[in-house]
Amino acid sequence: MSIVFQIALAALVLFSFVMVVGVPVAYASPQNWDRSKPLLYLGSGIWAILVIVVALLNFLVV
C-alpha cells in the first residue's frame, strides 16, 4: 500500500507542476480560449481527484 501512496503522491506533485505552468499560459493566450477551457476544467478535475486519492491513501497508510 505504501508503494501505491508514493506513486499517487508523485503523480500529484508532477501534475501540480504541469498545472502551475499550463494554467497561466492558457489564460494568457486569448485566441485559443475555446480550446483551452475544456482542458483547464479537465486538468482541474484530475488534480482534485488526485488530492482526494492521496488523502485517502494517506489515511490508510498511516
From Swiss-Prot:
One of its GO terms (biological process) is photosynthesis. Disruption phenotype: Grows slightly slower than wild-type under photoautotrophic conditions (40 umol photons/m(2)/s), grows less well under low light (7 umol photons/m(2)/s). Does not grow under photomixotrophic conditions (low light on glucose). PSII is normal, oxygen evolving capacity increases, the PSII:PSI ratio decreases slightly. Gene3D superfamilies: Photosystem II PsbZ, reaction centre. Keywords: Membrane, Photosynthesis, Photosystem II, Reaction center, Thylakoid, Transmembrane, Transmembrane helix. One of its GO terms (cellular component) is photosystem II reaction center. NCBIfam families: PS_II_psbZ. May control the interaction of photosystem II (PSII) cores with the light-harvesting antenna, regulates electron flow through the 2 photosystem reaction centers. PSII is a light-driven water plastoquinone oxidoreductase, using light energy to abstract electrons from H(2)O, generating a proton gradient subsequently used for ATP formation. The keyword Iron does not apply. Coiled coil: none annotated. The gene is psbZ. PSII is composed of 1 copy each of membrane proteins PsbA, PsbB, PsbC, PsbD, PsbE, PsbF, PsbH, PsbI, PsbJ, PsbK, PsbL, PsbM, PsbT, PsbX, PsbY, PsbZ, Psb30/Ycf12, peripheral proteins PsbO, CyanoQ (PsbQ), PsbU, PsbV and a large number of cofactors. It forms dimeric complexes. It is found in: Cellular thylakoid membrane. The chain crosses the membrane at residues 5-27, 38-59. This is Photosystem II reaction center protein Z. It holds the Pfam family Ycf9. It is a multi-pass membrane protein. Belongs to the PsbZ family. The lineage of its organism: Bacteria, Bacillati, Cyanobacteriota, Cyanophyceae, Synechococcales.
